[in-house]
Amino acid sequence: MEYNKKIVTDLTDLKGKKVILRCDFNVPINKTSGEITDYTRIDAALQTINYLLDKGVKLIVLSHLSRVKTLEDISSGKKSLKVVHKALKNRLLGKTVLFEENNRNKDLPKIIDGMEEGSLLLLENTRYADVNEKGEVVKLESKNDPSLGKFWASLADIFVNDAFGTSHRAHASNVGIAKNIKESAIGFLVNKELAKLSKAVVNPRKPVVAIFGGAKVSDKVPSIKNIGKFADKILIGGGMAFIFLKAKGFEIGKSLYEDDQLELTKELLSEFGNKIVLPVDAVVADSIKAAKGKRYDMEQFPADLAGFDVGKKTIKLFKKELKLAETVIWNGPLGVFENDAFNKGTLKVCKYIAKITAKKGCYSVIGGGDSAAAAAKCGVTHSFSHISTGGGASLEFFSGVELPGVACIKNKGEEGKVEAVKEKTTTTTESASKEKSSTAKTASKPATSKTTAAKKPAEKKPAAKKPAAKK
């Protein structure tokens, strides 16, 4: 799939413009300390952020953080972007980095008008809009509520999507904004992701070897079908391997599998059977939490145990298939990666892919998630050609479907237009203004700032200060 989307460098006359930027700051946070444990996603967004700030825009940044399902999720502060605000301030020294606790504050237009050129305003977690003041799950963000997308779009002149990790979702903070704004573009990160992933699937260097792992085959079927069209080999591991083995008549003991996917799995074997390579042995145990497992050939698989990793014979077989590969696409671990007793297959295959990438120039792509975590654990992250920042997004990309968060962006040369959106009786901002700040910890009126806000002249009256976000 080829892309001709506007990128941030195609935008002109940016000085003084208001730009709303969707980032993916869904970072891991230590539950005890409340500190961020991996800054990769924040650092990945800095190129676009710095580019826009250096152009003199007023930058409004949106992101989600985890899922928000209850008022407790909001009031506890555990899913607040305040910790991200702190990280951004530390990385954007010398630049004004503000934070607004209410991402639907009716005074946001005034706050943004009062911002200095080249400053940034981070709005609170977009998914706070998924729960209303009564604690009801309304999913205004996650289900792309028209009024919410229109409100956020009204805050800016231009929309930039640089959140690849959420581009497979049609949310109010990406598709909803893009439909209601005249000019839009993708950021450096999304552009890089599209280019790197495309290289693996559009006229890739042959032979192509794809590796699929993880627990559920249902998550991978569309990608297997699409990649199966051009891949030379498809290596199957992880929990999903057992449904393939069962479909071929092997004993899999108490290994979990999706019974409703059995017929579909048989169809995959029928269509791509000459390409699919399955485990020939497995490491089994009586529990996923077992301290150690025992290896069995598939022909001798015990009926009273379950498989949690590929065995040494399978690792050797997979390495043999990978040896001649010029392109490798990997999505999903080959075992229960979280347990050291069952991570050998994932780690050894990971190191081998890194080795052939470094030694013979194989083009290797990891589709994020646990596979990326495996590369980090092995210390070979920089040995891969590309490690995606979006597990779900990369998987959908591999299925051949255009991502909603990319499809909504204007193409190069396309004239700006705004799609008509039917108004609701109660607007999103009106709803937000009714929320109790004591429960949701959002500002029902503009937050105060330690910095002086710009003054708006008024006829025959003293100048009134504009609302300002917290610094």
Swiss-Prot record:
| PROSITE patterns given in the database record | PGLYCERATE_KINASE (PS00111)
Record's keyword terms, sorted: ATP-binding, Cytoplasm, Glycolysis, Kinase, Nucleotide-binding, Transferase
Single GO MF descriptor: ADP binding
- Please give the GO cellular component terms listed in this UniProt entry: cytosol
Give the GO biological process terms: gluconeogenesis; glycolytic process
Source species, domain of life: Bacteria
Disordered: annotated segments? 417-471
* Catalytic activity entry: (2R)-3-phosphoglycerate + ATP = (2R)-3-phospho-glyceroyl phosphate + ADP
Q: What is its main location?
A: cytoplasm
| EC annotation from Swiss-Prot or TrEMBL | 2.7.2.3
- What SUPFAM superfamilies would the database entry show? Phosphoglycerate kinase
Q: Which Pfam families match?
A: PGK
This protein's assembly is summarised as:
Monomer.
Q: Tell me the PANTHER family matching this sequence.
A: PHOSPHOGLYCERATE KINASE (PTHR11406), PHOSPHOGLYCERATE KINASE 1, CHLOROPLASTIC-RELATED (PTHR11406:SF23)
Query: What is the designated name of this protein?
Result: Phosphoglycerate kinase
Which gene carries the instructions for this protein?
Answer: pgk
